[in-house]
Amino acid sequence: MRPSGRNNDQLRNLKVTHNFTKHAEGSVLIEFGDTKVICTASVVAGVPKFKKDSGEGWLTAEYGMLPRSTHTRMDREAARGKQSGRTQEIQRLIGRALRASVDLTAIGENTIKVDCDVIQADGGTRTASITGASLAIADAIEYMKQNGMLDEQANPLLSQVAAISVGIYNNEPVLDLDYDEDSNAETDMNVVMNSNGGIIEIQGTAEGKDFSEEEFAKMLGLAKKGIKEIFATVF
């Protein structure tokens, strides 16, 4: 039995609020159960130096957690003077996943800057960030079209992207782990897929106990099922 009482293949309640903030070209509040993340997509003229005169745009992502998004308060990373290795890893994951969904040549020499800010954490913050950010990017691209920054016929969005966690909890494969499950899981895995059914990234780690190829296949099957439900619900 899962602590939440959910079935092993059951997602948490999923809710998306578009235009959650006033100023960003695209903004979304995404909620997976008690995990809540604000995802914004800002359009900035110009590109980094390594993209200058390439005719291509760029997309980059930042990730952070509010001090009391967790059970006990943590210091802001800005106050500590550096980002943790975890934060840097998650930012790179989000950026990689989202760049796989956008035709950078189609946005010209503009940069889409994604910010994912966790306001409440109960497991699955990186996967919620990817899903919410994909929605925010779609809104930002629509803003660019409506405001003459892109031709209305342009189609920079190659696909949508969603992500979910799966794992082995109490010797059983489960979908969409909350904090209680994640902190006690024998295996934790994050799966990122696009709306065409393609796999973008898989991160899987055994926590003190290995997992079999059969268990891996079951977890991947759960992830595919969950991501299909996410696309059907919020995209």
Curated annotation (Swiss-Prot):
It catalyses: tRNA(n+1) + phosphate = tRNA(n) + a ribonucleoside 5'-diphosphate. One of its GO terms (molecular function) is 3'-5'-RNA exonuclease activity. Pfam families: RNase_PH, RNase_PH_C. PROSITE patterns: RIBONUCLEASE_PH (PS01277). Phosphate binds at R86, G124, T125, R126. Keywords: Nucleotidyltransferase, RNA-binding, rRNA processing, Transferase, tRNA processing, tRNA-binding. Its EC number is 2.7.7.56. Homohexameric ring arranged as a trimer of dimers. Phosphorolytic 3'-5' exoribonuclease that plays an important role in tRNA 3'-end maturation. Removes nucleotide residues following the 3'-CCA terminus of tRNAs; can also add nucleotides to the ends of RNA molecules by using nucleoside diphosphates as substrates, but this may not be physiologically important. Probably plays a role in initiation of 16S rRNA degradation (leading to ribosome degradation) during starvation. Belongs to the RNase PH family. HAMAP family: RNase_PH. This is Ribonuclease PH. It comes from Francisella tularensis subsp. tularensis (strain SCHU S4 / Schu 4). The lineage of its organism: Bacteria, Pseudomonadati, Pseudomonadota, Gammaproteobacteria, Thiotrichales. The gene is rph.
